[in-house]
Amino acid sequence: HEIANVMGTDGIEYMLQATEDLPVDVRFMLPSCVPATPLDESGANLDYRAIDSFYDHPRVQGLAEMMNFVGTINGDPQVVEKIVASQAHHKKIDGHAPDLVGNDLNAYIAAGVYSDHECADIDDAMKKLKLGQFIMIREGTAARNLEALMPLIKSQKYFSRCMFCTD
């Protein structure tokens, strides 16, 4: 989503074109929050209409980390429009929900958020797994959660609902 924060849809188009015909298969999730917060100044303001046509691209997999968990939980119309558009195209919605619990977590997942990469400990990951989410285990420069979440990988019960990511 960073390139969209700077360049808007031109940035998304650039990334799709720049990764064509590479020896690796590069897939994309569309930015959910551009700008990242209502107070941010950004190179663009992308609503669901701005990104909708990108869902038809074969390498676009869905909507990236829905960072506006407050808007998701409270049914903010702009957030709901983005979620509904992604679902209408039969695409996934990745999450970004640190420390959500209880009814807030239930509402967030019920909105259709498929996964989360913000689990820093096993308890948070287990809550989300039991509610049906997939867990992205981060091991990168900003966060290192592999050691804390290793029991999920070792578990016969949960390893198939886990994946690795750098952010």
Model feature map: region roles:
Residues 1-90:
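Divalent-metal coordination cores built from histidine and acidic residues
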Residues 65-167:
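Active-site core of metal-dependent hydrolases
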